[in-house]
Amino acid sequence: MKRSKTLRAADAKVDREKLYAPLEAVRLAKETSATKFDSTVEVAFRLGVDPRKADQMVRGTVNLPHGTGKTARVLVFATGDRAAAAEAAGADIVGDDELINEIAKGNRLNEFDAVVATPDLMGKVGRLGRVLGPRGLMPNPKTGTVTMDVAKAVTEIKGGKIEFRVDKHSNLHFIIGKVSFSDEKLVENYAAALDEIIRLKPSAAKGRYIKKAALSTTMGPGIQLDSNRTRNLLVEEDPAAV
């Protein structure tokens, strides 16, 4: 099939044994992008942690300087003035008891990408854990999604703030933009994500912390990154200029 040939041709351009510099990897990812639409660019990390142990859990948020290329849809659980503030800040869905009941039934789950709640409603929102938890959407004070300042939370999420959490296989996944982004913007987003992961390294984690990093586009081949190159990513030697 024509599609298969395209994918095979893209895959053949990637050296599976090589660890690519971030700027080189971004350029290769664009070159091997095999879709007709503006593909998402994602980075996956394998960490040297045991997420089954509470003191090795890696979880947090990062403000990508150039956003992800997609405006997140935000649901806010709030009442009164807080609800009005959330709506004014651009929240897509705002409500309290009735909305909580709706979500508990499994309704509207495809209508939002992030959830914010005021502390006074968390007693009720807490029962949504079985619905929101598996989707990584449960509000949490540590990530700034349980707050009285819902307007600020909505603005930050809409502006490119993303939440991350290591999965049971010790992997982390980040969307760092679109193929249409400039090379510099993609690398700067990657650097922001990487810096935050490094900052959150658990003291209990032993041995090599970042075991593997790979960059890819939608349906594109994985490109192994040299995770030792963590600083000055834009001024390091550029293979294209050699």
From Swiss-Prot:
UniProt-recorded Gene Ontology molecular function terms: rRNA binding; structural constituent of ribosome; tRNA binding
Any Pfam family: Ribosomal_L1
InterPro entries named among the record's database cross-references: Ribosom_uL1_bac-type, Ribosomal_uL1, Ribosomal_uL1-like, Ribosomal_uL1/biogenesis, Ribosomal_uL1_3-a/b-sand, Ribosomal_uL1_CS
Keywords, ordered alphabetically: Repressor, Ribonucleoprotein, Ribosomal protein, RNA-binding, rRNA-binding, Translation regulation, tRNA-binding
Gene3D superfamilies: 3.30.190.20, 3.40.50.790
Assembly: Part of the 50S ribosomal subunit.
Protein name: Large ribosomal subunit protein uL1
Species of provenance: Kitasatospora aureofaciens
Lineage: Bacteria, Bacillati, Actinomycetota, Actinomycetes, Kitasatosporales
Gene for this chain: rplA
